[in-house]
Amino acid sequence: MAVTKELLQMDLYALLGIEEKAADKEVKKAYRQKALSCHPDKNPDNPRAAELFHQLSQALEVLTDAAARAAYDKVRKAKKQAAERTQKLDEKRKKVKLDLEARERQAQAQESEEEEESRSTRTLEQEIERLREEGSRQLEEQQRLIREQIRQERDQRLRGKAENTEGQGTPKLKLKWKCKKEDESKGGYSKDVLLRLLQKYGEVLNLVLSSKKPGTAVVEFATVKAAELAVQNEVGLVDNPLKISWLEGQPQDAVGRSHSGLSKGSVLSERDYESLVMMRMRQAAERQQLIARMQQEDQEGPPT
């Protein structure tokens, strides 16, 4: 029986279902079992039964002949080794391909990262430039506000000097009225009443009533003009008039008028005038000392 080339391309051991080292007895036994199962007479409806039966017969012919089997095993081994080499080569090619694809992906990712970094850098540079421009505008605005504040403070100092050219610091007046120690109404002059009487002449900075000396108070005006108007015009309550005299900040012309008025029966006594002159010569810092002293007297209370 001639063996076809197509049969040699097949795995005869696998066709019979036996091991490569199977003995002739095992080969024949396997052939009988396979041949019976696929005999054309038993499988009339299977068109491949005759072909398979023919292949089994050829396999038996090759594997039961020692020389033919040895030649077949040699060819089979060579084909197997070639297949293994091809598989290894395919695996190597596959690995090379995978490595190449991985490097390409890595290169693309790196390029993408570089592009993203470049975009981020450009964005950062733009933001820095924007902040620099906005910072310059803000700096200019702050410097403008500082210059404006300095100008306003300078103007205020100039106005304050103009208002107090003749006096020392802010003007302060001494207020006196009749009041008995046991008089709870304080002679009709509470702090609110005095403020209502005096604030119509100008801003009142401080007003301190002495509890140790009933009927006595000190008022501090913001301007000399307001103090002058109060001295010249305020008389207080009709049934209990106020006596108003200068303590600090009295203009020179007002001092002259007060001095000449004393010789003509002014309401100021000689003692009040001397006290007025001494107080006018004090520095502006004594204002706080005077107020603090009177507040301390109020806290201590009247002597027993």
Swiss-Prot record:
GO molecular function: RNA binding
Main localisation: cytoplasm
Any single Gene Ontology cellular-component annotation: spliceosomal complex
Database matches in InterPro entries: DnaJ_domain, DNAJC17_RRM, J_dom_sf, Nucleotide-bd_a/b_plait_sf, Pre-mRNA-splicing_ERAD, RBD_domain_sf, RRM_dom
Sequence segments annotated as region (Disordered): 79-145
Biased composition (Basic and acidic residues): 79-106, 118-145
Extent of the signal sequence: none
Keywords: Chaperone, Cytoplasm, Methylation, Nucleus, Phosphoprotein, RNA-binding, Transcription, Transcription regulation
SUPFAM superfamilies: Chaperone J-domain, RNA-binding domain, RBD
Record Gene3D superfamilies: 3.30.70.330, DnaJ domain
Modified residues (Phosphoserine): 112
Modified residues (N6-methyllysine): 264
Compartments, as annotated in UniProt: Cytoplasm; Nucleus
Residue ranges constituting the RRM domain according to the UniProt record: 178-249
SMART domains: DnaJ
Domain J span(s) in chain numbering: 11-76
Protein task: May negatively affect PAX8-induced thyroglobulin/TG transcription.
Protein name, per record: DnaJ homolog subfamily C member 17
Organism: Homo sapiens
Lineage summary: Eukaryota, Metazoa, Chordata, Craniata, Vertebrata
